Amino acid sequence: MKLRAVVLGLATLCTSTATFAGMVSTSSNLEFLAIDGQKASKSLGKAKTFTVDDTQSHQVVVRLNEIVGSGSNQSLFESNPVIVTFQGNAEDLVISAPAIRNLDSGDKFNQMPNITVKTKSGNAISAKVDVLKQEGLFPSGNVLNDLAEYNASGAAASVSKFTATTSANSMVAVPAGNAKANKGKVVVQGENVAEQQLQYWFQQADKETQTRFLNWAKSHK
């Protein structure tokens, strides 16, 4: 009897402390830009799924991409980055956005993103949704830095625990005269955001692209 009680007690303890992982995917018109403070990898972009802990809060940045218009008037609509914060679930989750058929609908989506999080069985999951405001010449390359600032602000969909993670994975701007690169990071200097982002993308490019860019810059002096 004592042995049975011990076994039952251990089973109850394990059940109460166990965590379960669910898969998160998106509707076909959404792409992941960042996941829990980390940049979404290219391989994940193709698979469009990742695993979450059902006991933790999770945060993703997504963008809606949709062909709008018809015939010769077709064009690609890309939304502003949208932050979605939600609680993990043992069941698989789907983050969805409605289809956008024209630019007017796209503008409305940018102003008030309509994004839902549901389980595979159709149950709605509470989520906080907000637009990630961006500035600069190449805003798409600055998602992690902007997200770190957002999470530090305490805004509606912010998650404070991801602030440090995001900052560590974003580019680092340093004052002029102190531009020695840190290993594993892209370090830039400049008087304004545009200059910093030009330097960032230059360092991201391969040697051939850098050479072409320098030749182009010389020809446009």
Swiss-Prot record:
Keywords: Signal. Residues 1-21 form the signal peptide. It comes from the Bacteria. Belongs to the UPF0319 family. NCBIfam families: PRK01904.1 (NF002516). HAMAP family: UPF0319. PANTHER family: UPF0319 PROTEIN YCCT. This is UPF0319 protein NTHI1987.
